């Protein structure tokens, strides 16, 4: 297996309009062989992250490893946690169970109102209130639907900051939000990934710190906040 820390802006595998510069292109340059189960355009790819999302991914080098990792994802044995800066004061401990499918009115979007949809479960583990307008949320997903966190947070009125597709652009709010205006992508980072090694069953756990672009925004927000605004909450 290979665990990578994908940068924001990088597409995972070749697709229309993205024949080069993808994660798969980079992997093939550095690795002699990858699992072939995903096909010619997706060698080794067991799961994906959106182009604008940074963070941890596990890649399979061999077919047997791919099959076992795919089973763990299917059986919801893989632990996946993200950090997201969201609008408003979101509540820690909230569980969102809302099926997701392709938006029939916009093929670029997913929706919780689609006719054809699949089960999706998201849990807000911990929340750090940055100021009255913004919260940093630690989020666990128990399923892996396309745009799942982005759709679910938007559906409860707390879209991810910087996510223009799901309503996370600039808002009229209380509190100093000037630092977020420099964001060029959704404030969403895959920060933790845990699974069993596909060969020997050892527990493997990886963590990734916020990348520079997100950390600089968060640090500036905290610097500008009043002490009474900063609060961490758990269920």
Predicted features, each with a name:
Residues 1-109, 187, 207-235:
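RNA pseudouridine synthases
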Residues 2, 133-137, 191:
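Short beta-strand micro-motifs in enzyme catalytic cores
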Residues 48-49, 89, 127-129, 163:
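Residue-level recognition of beta-strand microenvironments
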Residues 69, 145-153:
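Short beta-strand segments enriched for Tyr within beta-sheet-rich domains
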Residues 87, 138-142:
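A structural micro-motif recognizing beta-strand termini
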Residues 104-108, 119-121, 172-178:
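Short Pro/Gly-enriched beta-strand edge/turn motifs at strand-loop
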Residues 115, 132, 142, 152-235:
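Pseudouridine synthases involved in rRNA/tRNA modification
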Residues 124:
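Long C-terminal interaction/binding lobes of large macromolecular proteins
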């Amino acid at each position: 297996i290979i665990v990578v820390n994908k940068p924001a802006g990088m597409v995972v595998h070749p697709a229309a309009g993205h024949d080069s510069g993808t994660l798969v292109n980079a992997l093939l340059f550095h690795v002699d062989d990858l699992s072939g189960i995903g096909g010619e355009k997706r060698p080794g790819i067991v799961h994906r992250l959106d182009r604008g999302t940074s963070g941890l991914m596990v890649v399979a080098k061999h077919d047997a490893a791919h099959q076992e990792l795919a089973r763990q994802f299917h059986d919801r044995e893989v632990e996946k946690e993200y950090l997201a800066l969201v609008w408003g004061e979101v509540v820690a401990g909230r569980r969102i169970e809302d099926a997701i499918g392709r938006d029939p009115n916009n093929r670029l979007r997913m929706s919780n109102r689609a006719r054809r949809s699949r089960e999706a479960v998201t849990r807000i583990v911990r929340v750090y209130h940055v100021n009255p307008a913004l919260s940093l949320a630690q989020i666990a997903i128990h399923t892996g639907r396309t745009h799942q966190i982005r759709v679910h947070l938007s559906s409860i009125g707390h879209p991810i900051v910087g996510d223009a597709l799901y309503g996370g652009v600039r808002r009229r709010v209380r509190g100093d939000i000037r630092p977020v205006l420099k964001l060029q992508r959704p404030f969403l980072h895959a920060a933790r990934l845990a699974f069993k090694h596909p060969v020997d069953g050892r527990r493997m756990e990886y963590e990734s710190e916020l990348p520079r672009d997100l950390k600089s925004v968060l640090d500036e927000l905290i610097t500008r906040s009043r002490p009474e605004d900063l609060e961490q909450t758990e269920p």
